[in-house]
């Protein structure tokens, strides 16, 4: 358990500033003589350091449920308590100190977001578990983008031909609605995927939508480039500056420099991203000049998830509980509100781009080409 004399250094490492940087040491001092709460922090920190799941287990008790608002500080302290071990892991991997600072500054970014949205100091349990990726040295901030070491979950299969063209094919058993998006409640068709000596047969995925008609891809022309558990880097986009082409290209370039040096045994085949803003229907909603659409255009899109509450609170803020309460201050808020009022729905989406496609115009190292 961290001591009071260590807290200042950890606050700086997590880029925690303002009132929360004053409240957290006070909370730590208050629990010095409370063995139950100190032990609870140790247990939570242990789970963040060593659990192989990326969200709270079903039997997890939220700190805020039994501590009230102090539970958010309790969560934040549980994260900071892991940092000495997390820093040791970075040192063992020879991660440059600048990248370590960039990566763990995300704690301050999320704490600031939570204070802005909820008016509370600390972190919710949901946000706390996001940091398992940072703490376990699986996510790194490299400029505008973050990259998470994540084998592909296998929502689709990626085929390439001799000319370097890429095609996405839906995995077997996906329940799809009439629009080609996922729909477990009212499916119109379920995908079939077959492979054999002659080739691959399945439902193409075009611009994020699963096609109802199957197609055959002969093996002498096409091969499997990415399937379930194939090594990829998962892109996350933290809040911050503009999502420009140049900033994305710079981050991709840095990823090509960093990961082969520090994770040489993870020969990733490309990049993926699964997010609320990759909803393929945003083409109907947003301006063609939107950076979100420009980002999505660099990926081969596929459906991911169904109706997305995350998309709603990401656009309108966590305080908006209904469309009637939703603010309409930004162009995106106005456009999405009008879309929802006309009967539209929000979902999530995914996208993938192979190294051979030169993401954002950046050529990969030769060792990472298929």
Where are these predicted regions, by residue range?
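General N-terminal targeting signals
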Residues: 250-254, 285-290
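Conserved acetyl-CoA-binding loop-helix of GNAT-fold acetyltransferases
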Residues: 243-260
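Short acidic, S/G/P-rich loop/turn micro-motifs used as interaction or catalytic elements
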Residues: 239-246, 277-281
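Extended, charge-biased low-complexity segments
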Residues: 270-272, 279, 284
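Non-catalytic substrate-recognition and accessory regions of acyl/acetyltransferase enzymes
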Residues: 1-243, 263-270, 286-370
């Amino acid at each position: 358990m961290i001591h009071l004399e260590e807290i200042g250094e950890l606050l700086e490492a997590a880029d925690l500033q303002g009132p929360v940087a004053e409240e957290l040491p006070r909370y730590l001092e208050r629990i010095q003589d409370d063995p139950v709460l100190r032990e609870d922090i140790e247990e939570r920190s242990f789970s963040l350091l060593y659990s192989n799941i990326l969200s709270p287990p079903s039997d997890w008790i939220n700190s805020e449920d039994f501590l009230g608002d102090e539970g958010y500080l309790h969560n934040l302290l549980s994260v900071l308590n892991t940092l000495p071990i997390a820093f040791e892991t970075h040192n063992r991997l020879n991660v440059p100190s600048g990248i370590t600072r960039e990566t763990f500054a995300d704690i301050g970014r999320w704490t600031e977001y939570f204070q802005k949205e909820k008016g509370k100091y600390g972190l919710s349990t949901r946000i706390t578990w996001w940091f398992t990726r940072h703490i376990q040295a699986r996510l790194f901030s490299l400029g505008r983008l973050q990259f998470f070491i994540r084998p592909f979950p296998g929502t689709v299969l990626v085929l390439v031909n001799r000319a370097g063209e890429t095609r996405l094919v839906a995995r077997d058993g996906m329940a799809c609605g009439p629009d080609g998006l996922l729909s477990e409640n009212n499916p119109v068709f379920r995908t079939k995927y077959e492979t054999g000596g002659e080739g691959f047969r399945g439902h193409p995925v075009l611009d994020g939508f699963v096609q109802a008609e199957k197609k055959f891809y002969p093996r002498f022309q096409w091969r499997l480039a990415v399937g379930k558990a194939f090594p990829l880097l998962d892109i996350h986009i933290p809040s911050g500056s503009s999502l420009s082409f140049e900033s994305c290209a710079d981050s991709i370039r840095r990823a090509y420099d960093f990961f082969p040096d520090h994770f040489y045994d993870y020969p990733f085949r490309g990049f993926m991203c699964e997010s609320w803003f990759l909803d393929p229907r945003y083409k109907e909603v947003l301006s063609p000049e939107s950076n979100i659409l420009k980002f999505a255009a660099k990926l081969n899109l596929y459906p991911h998830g169904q109706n997305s509450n995350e998309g709603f609170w990401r656009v309108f803020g966590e305080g908006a509980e209904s469309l009637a309460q939703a603010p309409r201050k930004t162009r995106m808020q106005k456009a999405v509100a009008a879309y929802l009022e006309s009967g539209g729905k929000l979902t999530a989406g995914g996208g993938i781009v192979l190294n051979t496609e030169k993401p954002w115009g950046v050529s990969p190292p030769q060792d990472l080409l298929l």
